[in-house]
Amino acid sequence: VIQALARLSTDAVHGHDHADAYGSHIPPIYLSVIYEYTDYEQGLAVFTDRGKMLRYGREENPTTRALERVVTKLENSEDALAFNSGMAAISTVLLWYLKPGSKIVIPMEVYSTTLHILTVLAPRLGIRVEKVWPSAEAIAEAVDSETAMVFLEVMTNPTNKVIDLSYLAKHIDLEKVTLVADNTFTTPVLLKPIKYGAKLVVHSATKYLGGHNDVVGGVVAGRKSIMDELWEWRRMLGGILQPFEAYLVMRGVKTLEVRFEKQSTSAKAVAEFLAEHPRVEDVMYPGLSKSPYHDVAKKLFEKPLFGGVLSFRIRGSYEDTLRFMKKLKVIKRCPSLGGTESMAVLPVKAGAMFIEPEHRVKLGITENLVRLAIGLEDVNDIVEDLAQALS
C-alpha cells in the first residue's frame, strides 16, 4: 500500500518515488515495449513495486507506474491504474464489475458518453440501469438488495449539482454496494471520495490532472485488491496509458493545486458577475451563496473553493445564445475543461447528447444553457469578453 508523503502539492511533485540509476530527479520516459527476462528458464523478469513483472508494454510501463503512484497519494487510495482515456477507465470498471442481472444506480446527469456506454452494454450483458435524480436522497432510495454499483459524478456535468457523499455513507451499505465516484470536476484538491466510502475513484486525466489540453488519459484509484483485478482487465483490453502521455499527465499534476485554485477563484468572480448581468437568466455554480448546493459543497470540500466550471442561461432564445457564442474572443468555443484556456460550449450540442431529452428538460439543460470552463487567463479579460459578447 502506497502511503501519502505529505500535503497534496508535495505529493503531486514528489509522489512518483522514482529512483533513477543516473540520479535524474525527473522520471524518464521509458519507450521500450519489451523487457528482457532475468531468468528465461523460469520466465522471470524485473518486478515493479506493484509486484507485476515488466515484460510487455500492454501490461506495465515504469513511466506509467510513476504516474500511478502519484495518483494513489493524491486520492489517499491503496493503488491506482492509468488508462489511455477517461472512458477507457470507466469502461474497464463497468466491464469488470457488472454481470448479467446486475443493477447499477446512476444519476440521469453524468457525462453523456458514460450514459451511452451503459445504454449499449445493458441489453447485451443483461444489466439493469436505474437512472435517478442527481441527489444523494434519490440515489439512496433507489439502492436495494439487488444493487451492485452506484456510479456518480460528485459535481454533475453540466449543471453543477453537488451530491452529498456523506449522506450516501450513512444510508447505503458501501461494503455491499460498490460506489464509484467520478472526481474529475472536483479533483483531489477539493475532495477525496474514498474518505466517504467510495471503493473506486475515476478521473478523465485529460481535464484538470493533465491540465494543458494536450493529452488524453484516464485514471482509476481504489483498493489494491480491486486494482489487481482491474489490472488484469486492462491487460486484456489493452487500455494502458502510454509512457509519453503518462509523462505529460505527471507533469501537469505537479501544478494541479496552483492551477485549480486560480481557476476556482476566477470562476467564482465570473459567476458573481454573470449573476448580476441583465442578459443572464440564472447561474449554476455552488460557490454562489444562493445556490441550493452551496451548503453541501462547503461541508464536503476541503478548501473554500468550488471548482473552475460554471453554467449559465442566456436570457433569450437559442439564436440569441448562438450569437453570444460567436462573439466570444478570449474564451474559446471548445467542448472540454480543466486546461489553461477558458472554453465555452452549449451542452445540448456537446456533452449532453446522450442524456434523454425528457431528462434534459427536467435537469435544466436547455438550448440557452452555456457551460463555461475557466482557464488561467486574467479574470478581468474573461469578464470583459463575456460583457462584450452579452452586449
Where are the regions a protein language model picked out?
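Positively charged, small/polar-rich N-terminal and surface patches that mediate targeting and assembly
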Residues: I2-S9, G15-H16, E36, P62, ...
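Short, solvent-exposed beta-strand edge segments and adjacent coil->beta transition regions
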Residues: G51, V215, L305-V309, E367-R371
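Short, well-ordered beta-strand elements within core beta-sheets of diverse protein domains
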Residues: V249-V258, G308-R315, R371-G375
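N-terminal glycine-rich, Lys/His-bearing helix-loop that initiates the first secondary-structure elements
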Residues: V1-G51
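Conserved N-terminal alpha-helix of the aminotransferase class I/II PLP-enzyme fold
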Residues: D39-A88, T113-V120
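Conserved PLP-enzyme active-site core in the AAT-like
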Residues: I2-Q3, S9-A21, D79-R279, M284, ...
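PLP-dependent enzyme catalytic core of the Aspartate aminotransferase-like
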Residues: T119-V120, R128-E130, R259, K326, ...
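Conserved small-domain helix->loop->beta segment predominantly found in fold-type I
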Residues: K268-E341, I355-V361
